[in-house]
Amino acid sequence: SGQENPKQNDSLEVFRITKYDKNWNKIKSCGLYGANTTVPFDAGSARMTHSGDHLLVRTCHEMYKSSDGNNHQANVTIEVDMPSMTITDSYTGIMNVDYGYVSHSFNQFIKTDGNHIVALDHGDAHPRSAVLVKYNSDFTTGKFFPSYFEQVSNIDVVTYPEYTAGHYNYTGAAIGG
């Protein structure tokens, strides 16, 4: 679940992941605070996968106001240790696709390949493509993105043509699965 954060408060919980038993009794939850997020789940989807004790979430958010005065949208990745229900890693910052960042990301998918995260995002600008991203680090360590120096592998599966009639949002494409 999520909570809007229009005042850009770094101590406000904006994403909450809750664990339930098979009878829908709440067991435990964990949260992500601030996280460069004003509107969680904005203009995209929320998908999850798990492997062993690790829950991996790929979703999106509207971010804190940037230097151009706008609140841009991008993807979000969160890793949770399920037995302890603690967030072990997350990425909500601004970077480029070499770090798994896609903006705007209108649809997000996540799977695992062995001990690596594989994700697909529908980007309209950075990059303007359906981009497949593979994280090169071993997420079972609790860190899918351990350092600034460890980039991801990425490939544009489909590149969308330039759109000059206004904002980049229109791509003429839909990704399903």
What are these regions (language model features)?
Residues S1, D53-R58, G114-A119, G177:
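Entry beta-strands of beta-propeller and related beta-repeat scaffolds
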Residues S11-R16, K26-S51, C60-S66, H72:
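Asp-box/WD-like beta-propeller blade repeats and closely related beta-sheet repeat scaffolds
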Residues L12-W24, N70-T86, A130-D138:
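Beta-propeller blade signature
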Residues I27-G34, I87-M95, T141-T159:
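Beta-propeller fold detector
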Residues G34-S45, N96-S105, V152-A174:
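Short glycine-/Asp-/Thr-/Trp-enriched loop segments that recur within the blades
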Residues N70, E79, D89-S105:
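Extended alpha-helical scaffolding regions
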